[in-house]
Design a protein with these regions (language model features):
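Glycine-rich phosphate/pyrophosphate-handling loop used in enzymes and phosphotransfer proteins
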Residues: 1-238
Length: 238
């Protein structure tokens, strides 16, 4: 088996999924790892929006005007649309390049840099519609959530929250358009499995939060006691 591994490494040497530099294993290289911007205080204690400069955590204007249905949303890292993070570059290869070999790397990063205490009754991924699921072949959020659930010894259900209809991609839409786009797009398959439970909703990225907010609203309508949100990366300029 070691000979096979050695031969594969010789023919297909491991490379950093962000910059394509050769590495000892499938992992972000040291330069790309150091270029990731962690999501740190000061931030909104509700949605996790990051604020520039110093000062204490405080609620953002968005959460003051329209309190979300989730209790907390947190990201492991931040990125800007004009300066993509190496973590997002790797995520795009996983998600759009359908490179499932990156699932363990990204899932481990999510678990190891998780800013939340994971004591929830249930971990649920943001679901894909059937057309996207068939095209991609997997739900990236489900792969991330399952890895964290197994590692933390928590229950995981990829089928409990479902999309009732296909929605156009959120990319390029404004905040109000994003909310309308996903309005009533989700449903809970078994309300008894959600009732009075604490739920951690997992996704890959968060921009304005419209999708996770609609998911949280749907879960609360089904009787969930509390919904938190965990994502790999969050847009710092949404």
């Amino acid at each position: 088996m070691r000979a096979v591994t050695w031969a594969l490494d010789l023919l297909f040497p491991p490379r950093c999924p962000a910059c394509d530099r050769r590495t000892e294993r499938v992992a972000l290289c040291a330069d790309c790892t150091s270029a990731i911007t962690p999501a740190r205080s000061p931030l909104c204690p509700v949605c996790g929006e990051s604020f520039p400069g110093g000062g204490p955590d405080h609620r953002c204007t968005r959460c003051l005007i329209r309190p979300p249905h989730f209790a907390r949303a947190r990201a492991c890292a931040l990125y800007r649309s004009d300066h993509p993070s190496p973590l997002v570059e790797a995520l795009h290869r996983f998600k759009y390049g359908r490179d499932v070999t990156l699932a363990p790397l990204l899932s481990a990063y999510l678990d190891e840099h998780c800013p939340l205490s994971i004591d929830h009754d249930l971990l649920i991924p943001v679901p894909l519609d059937l057309a996207r699921l068939r095209w991609r072949g997997f739900n990236q959020a489900a792969m991330l959530a399952r890895f964290v659930a197994v590692r933390r010894g928590r229950r995981f259900d990829a089928m409990l929250l479902q999309r009732r209809r296909a929605t156009p991609p959120q990319v390029g839409l404004g905040e109000s358009e994003r909310r309308r786009n996903v309005a009533r797009a989700f449903a809970v398959r078994d309300r008894s499995a959600v009732r009075n439970r604490t739920i951690l909703l997992v996704d890959d990225v968060m921009t304005t939060g419209a999708t996770v907010e609609e998911c949280a609203r749907t879960l609360h309508s089904a009787g969930a006691r509390r919904v938190d949100v965990l994502v790999l990366a969050r847009a710092a300029d949404a």
